[in-house]
């Protein structure tokens, strides 16, 4: 017999091997219709799991996040079941899921599929779900599983990687699939789902392999939740920087040029220059020296830094030179800044040395990860490396955190979290193997954040290979968590490059290195701001601040040119709409382009030597003298 304690405080004895569902039916009948899974001794289990030891049992219902994850996971298998009936001989590979949805990658072989097929696929899914099929898990040996999936080379490859682990196969009706995650125990709970989109994918993200099909979907326990989520997805789509850019033309992408290689168009380039000048000016005031360094380098420098060992898969292939040397497009700016420091002998009195650069880098992002400006293969990082003494670590780190917060205030960024990113101590391949160094750096990082009295989360496995870091995390419009700012403590690279400074006693010491970026890459930061402002940038950032609209080009253009000249001389970004279109069309166009101020020029404006303007999204028209309008714009420029 085993003793089971329920969450309501009840304790009962059961036969060893009694499953959770039996206990629910006997003692928790109110939970029977809404039960999805359970925690047993704090471990998530399925309702048909037999219990074989004493423990505490907690039933979770439709509202629990783990229930939604299990539902979406199980729905992905229901989709596979339907697809296997409609499209015989397909080869399922693998998928993923969370509380909001799922996807599965499938080799359809000779079959063609598009989103136009979704209705018929969903219909088949409903037909299967309504059969109320039990979903059963069974454990198999490696050899047995190989025989079952002998006709699916993708599954055989996955089995090969897990041959020494337990191999679970799930069955619903006559459909089976290899799976290690948890399921709900009957298809009757799968009622409210929607297939969302199709994209290309590669097995294990390897673009050298055959391109297969990825199908996305989402599933909920009731219709209202599904409908609400579909509305949210539509809102996210409309807030996605790629969608916003369709009307505003800040950047473009070209498959002919290459994947992940963006073009900055005129208006996007204007905003980028403003951001770059802003951050460079702040860094110069903060004691940084700004440099330019080569975008390619001898591969040996990345061997010295360790990037070649730990980052090779993210680097573009080497270029073979006639003299036998190998050059690579740099994936990081760090080694170049190490060489600048090494070019001179420093005294302890001269530290900190702060070297900053808007450094262009190239990274071979997987094709499936490339997205708009958010994930690209060519990027420019707001990068800096600070060389300090041990006694300067905390003071310098705190300055950087304050710098980040100041910049975020200016850009009106207020929804972010601090994350301390540590190594995974078991992963000796990914991280430099020096426990003492890692423990020291991680402890210092945590002490600093506690002293600053800032809330933070801690995660393992997200550190750089050479040291732990503070990441500032934001959410994109699509719900992806991205790093906007990063500060890293590094005891390793200065030693690998033999960097030193002369101490007070005349001896040579190795400096400590802080890597930091305040606004990420220009590409990622711009994509975030585009979503943050939904294309309507604050006045000081707007690529075009004022548009002049002459009612009649023959009669009003000269006065418009005069106003434009005055505004340009005062430092404002202004254009004249000289299209041969109606006034209402030009005003609609200005609204579409989200221009902060629209000035209409007609007979009255010329006669009284005034302007008539209105602001974006406002109907009120205001008349005033140009000098007063300039004072208004100057005050707007100061509102960061």
From Swiss-Prot:
> What are the disulfide bonds?
none
* Chief place where the protein resides: cytoplasm
Question: Keywords of this protein's UniProt record, alphabetized?
Answer: Aminoacyl-tRNA synthetase, ATP-binding, Cytoplasm, Ligase, Metal-binding, Nucleotide-binding, Protein biosynthesis, RNA-binding, tRNA-binding, Zinc
Q: Which InterPro entries match?
A: aa-tRNA-synt_IIb, aa-tRNA-synth_II, aa-tRNA-synth_II/BPL/LPL, Anticodon-bd, Anticodon-bd_dom_sf, Beta-grasp_dom_sf, TGS, TGS-like
Positions of the TGS domain: 1-61
Q: Give the GO cellular component terms, alphabetically.
A: cytoplasm
| Textual note on the cofactor | Binds 1 zinc ion per subunit.
Per its UniProt entry, which superkingdom is the organism in? Answer: Bacteria
The EC category is ligase
Q: Which EC numbers does the record give?
A: 6.1.1.3
A single GO BP = threonyl-tRNA aminoacylation
Q: Which residues bind Zn(2+)?
A: 334, 385, 515
Q: Where is this region: Catalytic?
A: 240-538
Cofactor dependency: Zn(2+)
Q: Does the keyword Ligase apply?
A: yes
Q: Where in the cell is it found?
A: Cytoplasm
A GO term, aspect molecular function = ATP binding
Reaction catalysis annotation: tRNA(Thr) + L-threonine + ATP = L-threonyl-tRNA(Thr) + AMP + diphosphate + H(+)
Q: Which Pfam families match?
A: HGTP_anticodon (PF03129), tRNA-synt_2b (PF00587), tRNA_SAD (PF07973)
Q: What does this protein do?
A: Catalyzes the attachment of threonine to tRNA(Thr) in a two-step reaction: L-threonine is first activated by ATP to form Thr-AMP and then transferred to the acceptor end of tRNA(Thr). Also edits incorrectly charged L-seryl-tRNA(Thr).
Family under the similarity heading: Belongs to the class-II aminoacyl-tRNA synthetase family.
Output the NCBIfam families linked to this UniProt entry. Answer: thrS (TIGR00418)
Give the record's subunit note: Homodimer.
Q: What is this protein called?
A: Threonine--tRNA ligase
Query: Origin organism of this chain?
Result: Phytoplasma mali (strain AT)
Organism ancestry: Bacteria, Bacillati, Mycoplasmatota, Mollicutes, Acholeplasmatales
């Amino acid at each position: 017999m085993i003793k089971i304690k329920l969450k309501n405080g009840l304790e009962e004895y059961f036969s060893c091997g009694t499953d959770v569902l039996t206990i629910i039916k006997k003692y928790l009948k109110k939970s029977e219709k809404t039960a999805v899974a359970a925690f047993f001794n704090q471990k998530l289990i399925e309702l048909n799991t037999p219990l074989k030891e004493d423990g505490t049992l907690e039933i979770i219902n439709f509202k629990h996040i783990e229930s939604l994850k299990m539902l979406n996971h199980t729905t992905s298998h229901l989709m596979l079941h339907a697809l296997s009936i409609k499209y015989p001989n397909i080869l399922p590979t693998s998928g993923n899921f969370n509380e909001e949805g799922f996807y599965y990658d499938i080799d359809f072989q000779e079959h063609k599929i598009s989103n136009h097929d979704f209705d018929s696929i969903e219909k088949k899914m409903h037909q299967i779900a309504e059969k109320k099929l039990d979903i059963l898990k069974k454990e198999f040996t490696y050899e047995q599983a190989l025989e079952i999936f002998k006709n699916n080379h993708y599954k055989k490859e996955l089995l090969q990687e897990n041959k020494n682990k337990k191999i679970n196969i799930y069955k619903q009706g006559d459909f089976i699939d290899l799976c290690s995650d948890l399921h709900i125990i009957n298809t009757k709970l799968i009622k409210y789902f929607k297939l969302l989109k199709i994209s290309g994918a590669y097995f294990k993200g390897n673009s050298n392999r055959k391109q297969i099909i990825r199908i996305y979907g989402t599933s909920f326990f009731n219709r209202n939740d599904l409908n609400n989520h579909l509305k949210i997805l539509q809102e996210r789509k409309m807030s996605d920087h790629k969608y916003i850019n369709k009307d505003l033309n800040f950047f473009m992408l070209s498959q002919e040029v290459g994947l992940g290689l963006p073009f900055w168009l005129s208006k996007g380039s204007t905003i980028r220059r403003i951001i770059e000048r802003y951050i460079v000016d702040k860094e110069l005031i903060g004691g940084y020296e700004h440099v330019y360094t080569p975008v390619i380098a001898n591969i040996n420098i990345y061997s010295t830094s360790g990037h070649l060992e730990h980052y090779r898969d993210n680097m573009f292939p080497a270029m073979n030179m006639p003299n036998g040397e190998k050059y690579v497009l740099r994936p990081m700016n760090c080694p170049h800044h190490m060489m600048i420091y090494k070019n001179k002998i420093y005294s302890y009195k001269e530290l900190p040395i702060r070297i900053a650069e808007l450094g262009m880098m190239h990274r071979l992002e997987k094709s499936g990860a490339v997205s708009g400006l958010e994930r690209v293969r060519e990027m420019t990082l707001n990068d800096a490396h600070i060389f300090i003494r041990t006694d300067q670590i905390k003071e310098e780190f705190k300055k950087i955190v304050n710098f980040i917060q100041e910049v975020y205030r200016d850009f009106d960024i207020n929804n972010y979290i601090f994350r301390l990113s540590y190594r995974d101590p078991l992963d000796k391949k990914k991280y430099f193997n020096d426990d003492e160094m890692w423990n020291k750096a991680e402890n210092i990082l945590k002490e600093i954040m506690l002293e600053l009295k800032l809330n933070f989360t801690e995660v393992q496995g997200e550190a750089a290979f050479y040291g732990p870091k503070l990441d500032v995390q934001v959410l994109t419009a699509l719900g992806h968590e991205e790093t906007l700012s990063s500060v890293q403590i590094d005891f390793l690279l200065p030693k690998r490059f033999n960097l030193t400074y002369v101490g007070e006693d005349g001896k040579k010491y190795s400096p400590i290195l802080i890597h930091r970026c305040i606004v990420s890459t220009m590409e990622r930061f711009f994509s975030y701001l585009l979503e943050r402002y939904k294309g309507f940038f604050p006045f000081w950032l707007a690529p075009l601040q004022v548009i002049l609209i002459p009612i009649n080009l023959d009669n009003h253009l000269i006065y418009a040119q005069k106003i434009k000249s005055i505004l340009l001389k005062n430092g404002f970004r202004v254009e004249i709409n000289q299209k041969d279109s109606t006034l209402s069309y030009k005003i609609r166009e200005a609204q579409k382009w989200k221009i902060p101020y629209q000035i209409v020029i007609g007979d009255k404006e010329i006669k009284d030597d005034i302007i008539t303007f209105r602001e974006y999204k406002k109907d009120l028209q205001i008349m005033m003298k140009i000098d007063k309008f300039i004072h208004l714009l100057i005050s707007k420029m100061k509102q960061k």
